[in-house]
């Protein structure tokens, strides 16, 4: 189970008042939610409403000003063990997939990043070629894409590769930040 409890996040405003100091813009105010195992949840909102910020809090990339994120009873921000618990159970597909895929890696290496996580967690070696082929086919791409580079794929195809990488480590939770916006 994943929980957010009374999450507050603010950022320094671009507009600064020289007399009274810096102002802060509240992005998330007292947000609480519980996502039970096996649940698929979509968060909808206008541009700039805090959806991506909430995603960054959920995946441990942004510590909130106050409040708590809890995964399976372990506070994400309270300890290194909490962050490790999160890293072992969560995978993310970013909105800007072009910067999340190393342009010098072949597709098999990009997906291999997720397979490395799975191998470490399970303590066993995988047949990487077979797993990469399976994952590419799972997201609707041919297995021979494994030898290509990101610049050789369309935006939608590269987005699918990023989804395959997220699935590769067999996470308990996959967080998508507008991850299907570029699929063809």
Where do the protein language model's features map onto the residues?
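Conserved catalytic motifs of ABC-family nucleotide-binding domains
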Residues: 170
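Conserved ABC ATPase "signature" region
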Residues: 126-144
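Helix-to-loop junction immediately C-terminal to a conserved catalytic motif
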Residues: 59
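The feature captures the beta-strand-to-loop junction immediately N-terminal to the Walker
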Residues: 44-46
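Conserved ABC ATPase signature
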Residues: 149-153, 157
């Amino acid at each position: 189970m994943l929980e957010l409890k009374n999450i507050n996040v603010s950022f320094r405003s671009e507009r600064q008042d020289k007399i009274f100091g810096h102002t802060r813009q509240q992005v998330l105010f007292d947000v609480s939610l519980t996502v039970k195992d096996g649940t698929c949840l979509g968060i909808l909102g206008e541009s700039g409403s805090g959806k991506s910020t909430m995603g960054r809090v959920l995946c441990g990339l942004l510590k909130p000003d106050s409040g708590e994120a809890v995964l399976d009873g372990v506070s994400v921000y309270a300890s290194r063990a909490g962050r490790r618990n999160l890293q072992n159970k969560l995978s993310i597909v970013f909105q800007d997939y072009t910067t999340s895929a190393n342009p010098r890696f072949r597709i098999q290496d990009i997906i291999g990043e997720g397979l490395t996580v799975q191998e470490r967690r399970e303590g066993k070696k995988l047949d990487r070629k077979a797993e990469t082929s399976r994952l590419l086919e799972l997201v609707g791409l041919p297995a021979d894409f494994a030898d290509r580079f990101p610049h050789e794929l369309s935006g939608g195809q590269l987005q699918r590769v990023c989804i395959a990488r997220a699935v590769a480590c067999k996470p308990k939770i996959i967080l998508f930040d507008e991850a299907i916006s570029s699929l063809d």
